Amino acid sequence: MDGGGRVYIAIDLKSFYASVECVERKLDPLTTNLVVADPTRTEKTICLAVTPALKAWGISGRARLFEVVHRVEELNRERLAAAVRGGHIRKDADGKYDFVTESFDANALAADPALKLGYYVAPPRMKLYEKYSAKIFSIYTKYIAPEDIIVYSIDEIFADATRYLRTQRLSARELAMAMIREVLYTTGITATAGVGTNLYLAKVAMDIVAKRAPADRDGVRLAELDERSYREKLWCHKPITDFWRVGRGTARRLEALGCFTMGDVARLSEQNESALYRAFGVNAELLIDHAWGWEPTTVDMVKAYRPVSKSLSSGQVLKEPYDFDRGRLIVREMTELLALELVKKQFVTKKLELTISYDRESLTVLRPGTDMRDTVYAASRTGRVYTGAVTPDLYGRPHPGHAHGTGKLDRWTSSTKRIMDAVLGVYDRVVDPDLLIRRVNLAAVELVREDELPQEAPEQLSLFADCGEWEERKARERAADEKERRLQKTTLRLQQKYGRNAVLKGMNLLEGGTTIERNRQIGGHRSGEEDRT
């Protein structure tokens, strides 16, 4: 690789959550069949991680648990039939064919056709994964200073290695391998890496080229790209959705322009650049740069970036459909937690946004039509005719359109009471009481730090207003706000010391409440320390 410019390294820990679970069980992460999933959420739950050994059987890295169950059952039927045909299995005392025993190891399964394919289901332990991630980051900082590292996610980093190659007398490949080897020998977890002359090329080298390259004896894969090799190796690569920041929607719009590869995008940018700008607006610039293998952003620029506007949000998918009243309970709980989060992070807001997604089973067909537009639906819970929007879901089934509303406050605040009144007002206004609720999203937007509050506009009083009464009312409001503020801070201190479930409200104990369970989670998944919180 040309040593004249900057050199970046991207590292992605292989099946990180699953690898941690294997290491904790003293199992080989590369040969053990294991998925990380919470079976208490039913078999529809999405697997957070799947080991490479289980992926090799055709199981997706983001499969739902029931898909894993069905695929393994199918594989075992095929294995049993093949073992019987090969004479590896004899009939038992009941005259039936069955496996000798079960194995969770890929090598053992490959060596003995008489073994049943088994797999572990490991409940998520997010706190444990965070500890491993912190330990691995400390290893990276032995080679590269923290200011030259971007933590992209819990299991992925970017590093500007430019100024370390000469001092450590290593090539970029050698430096990346040294970092990965130490992580492997210290934690038992292997990784995939990409080296590139910019951040984009390092990412693509890792995501596309390295993950398709043969692994070494430790399961490590590494690839390098510069602008020239990128064009040689990847301009014809399909599908285009393998590239960073190219989703299915972008791919569909590119196909409409006759672009199916990055090479096609690069060619169109030369022949008819305006077509890309008409289709993608300002985002066309990023797409064109990436098509040519260009990326001007550096680690320093990423570190220095500050978003123009800030927001705090939370969302949850309910385990079962909730009616209007139980949905309102969930919104109250989420609002309480959001207000505490504002206080904790020292933000205030003037605007709240609430989005409610309904359950597909909310509707039944009252009178069939030729399509969704002229079909008459009724609410399945109440039988009332439904007149709202109906949209197809991913499978083409009719689904009620979501409800969305905005609540505005008359002042900057993090007061639970003020925010609660605004959010519940939105809920009561926009949510259809006949429908069943499945997903709730709540956001405080346009946040301002408490120490950066803009000057409030003066309040205009009428000529007939009683100024004394107005001042007394304002004083009472300030006193109530200050009292609530002290209570919020006390709650946060107690939660910090004794756990997030140390202070609860009566509503959290009602049937259907989810705060107690959510307080035991990290990022919406089990922390692994449920008994301690």
Language model features by range: what are they?
Residues 190-192, 353, 441:
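Residues at or immediately flanking beta-strands
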Residues 14-16, 40-44, 359-363, 447-451:
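Short, charged/polar surface micro-motifs in flexible loops or helix N-caps
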Residues 73-89, 324-332, 339, 435, ...:
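Contiguous hydrophobic segments
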Residues 19-21, 203, 364-366, 450-452:
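Short acidic, gly/pro-rich beta-turn/loop elements at beta-sheet edges
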Residues 20, 388-533:
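Acidic, metal-coordinating catalytic segment for phosphate/diphosphate chemistry
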Residues 10, 242, 252-437, 452, ...:
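DNA-contacting surface of Y-family translesion DNA polymerases
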Residues 1-290, 295-299, 469-533:
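Gly/Gly-Pro- and Ser/Thr-rich, intrinsically disordered tail segments characteristic of DNA damage-repair
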